[in-house]
Amino acid sequence: MELIPVLEPEQKPQNRHWYVLEPTGAAPGVSVGHTCSFLPAAHHHDEDGGGKGKIVIVGGANPSGSFADSYIINLDTHQWDLPDWEGLQARYEHCSFTPESEPQSLWVFGGAEKSTNRNCVQALRFSDGGEGRRFWQSVQVTGVPPSGRTYHTNSACVGNRLFVFSGGEAGSSAVTDAQLHVFDAVSVTWTQPDTTGTPPAQRHGHVITAVGSDIYIHGGMSGEKFHSDMFTLNTESLKWQKVKAKGDLPPGVAAHSSVTFNKNIFIFGGMTADGATNSMFKFQCDKQRWTLLKFEGDLPPGRLDHSMCLLPWRVKMEDSEHADVQHLCFVFGGMDTQGVIFNDCLVTVLT
């Protein structure tokens, strides 16, 4: 097993190294297809410089079934917590998002359960009534929702709008639907606006990530084919464009994950024709250039169907009362192609 060092609370991580986070308390079991989201502390906690926020892990699955529970890493106490939230319909390979108008909320769409795909939307509001029991509410949507599908992302939201393109039907098959679906979290309405340009072919296991007002789609698979292409959708003009990328082009890959930082997209892991990978690539949106990132020290095991989020990590500065913030990529769980499923927490600095 690789010997990846543990990053302690407020310790400064080095660039080009992987670390393990080991929160205390009862960690989740091994899982695939969950989502990870960082939620900042509510403003009233921030006046004293406290309030590091929390990472919320929702749903997922392993051979024992799909999950209706959520786990929290409380970054102030560096502890796992299993909150008393009820009402989530069990799902994995779903999508999670936080609308701009409700920063203290978490919404989910789609995903799969044992025998069926979901197309429902549920929302959990942290602003509801103090620290008491909270409930996932099923959102009564208007308009025509997409068909049930897997759609594994936590970064497909621009403002208050979630953008849904393609997704998984069953097994290695993508949905046949080539329509763009847009969910407005304020009006709770689904629409299917017309687009122009060249859309991607239908696929599942693709990365969908927002950078400014653009949505980027990378990779994915359909049948036996692994895609290596990248497309952008301008969410204002609704025009698709194929990206003419340069640099270290990633191979065809599916079930990878992404985070965005400073107009750069970072992808890690996924399944390629050669099996699960542990490579990380950076895409500079302004230069349209890919770079394969090089690391020192041990690397995490290759994995797919994990989830990642951007983690603002507070670092205690010597001779100072103030903390510096470094932005980390946080990775949880996933599996390799030999059937080993993970429940580890990994981080690396994004530069």
UniProtKB/Swiss-Prot annotation:
Kelch repeats lie at residues 54-102, 105-156, 162-210, 214-263, 264-313, 328-351. Keywords: Kelch repeat, Repeat. It comes from the Eukaryota. Coiled coil: none annotated. Rab9 effector required for endosome to trans-Golgi network (TGN) transport. PANTHER family: RAB9 EFFECTOR PROTEIN WITH KELCH MOTIFS. This is Rab9 effector protein with kelch motifs. It comes from Danio rerio (Zebrafish).
